[in-house]
Regions:
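Helix-turn-helix
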Residues: 1-14, 18
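C-terminal peripheral helix-coil segments that are non-catalytic and often amphipathic
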Residues: 54, 87-103, 121-171
């Protein structure tokens, strides 16, 4: 019953923010693991995409909540929470891309922040494609039966990102 929620939380806003905090902690753990275990940007991308697909299916309710915030129906939260929600991934992605540019792993001279933004947009779309009904149907419309093969979808996204970032081929 909905009334049980108020036994543990003072109001629905407190409940919502607690759910958000938990989902952000999950995101932080995925990013920390990807950065600490991968040797370079290519490895990070592979780890992030694999974790994203897996976690999107396991934690689809958090992604639906995130989608709800972004859709405009939770305007009172959106402005205040954008730094809190996006700040973690934006900094990690920007730093990884800057490092890869300095090391010559990617050849594009496009600003790292802009690349991080587009990179995150692709990840976000994939995340929703595995957790929100509209985006699941959208993925199926574009990809047909291939949408059912997580390995093909992950590998295709990774190759697309590597091409977009103008990553040098693996040696």
């Amino acid at each position: 019953s909905v009334g049980v929620i108020y036994k543990y939380f003072t109001d629905k806003n407190t409940f919502f923010l607690q759910c958000l905090d938990h989902s952000l902690e999950l995101l932080s753990n995925v990013l920390k693991e990807a950065v600490s275990e991968a040797k370079d940007l290519r490895g990070c991308i592979r780890k992030i995409v694999a974790a994203l697909i897996s976690n999107s299916k396991i934690h689809s309710n958090y992604n639906a909540m995130y989608n709800e915030i972004m859709s405009g129906s939770c305007r009172k939260y959106a402005k205040d929470l954008v730094d809190r929600i996006e700040g973690r991934s934006a900094e990690v992605y920007r730093t990884l891309i800057e490092q890869a540019q300095k090391e010559g792993m990617i050849t594009t001279e496009t600003d790292a922040g802009i690349l991080a933004f587009f990179f995150d947009n692709l990840l976000m779309m994939m995340q929703f494609s595995y957790s929100c009904d509209y985006y699941k149907d959208r993925m199926r419309l574009f990809c047909g039966d291939l949408a059912d093969d997580e390995d093909i979808m992950a590998d295709s996204l990774i190759r697309f990102m590597e091409a977009a970032l103008q990553m040098k081929p693996m040696e």
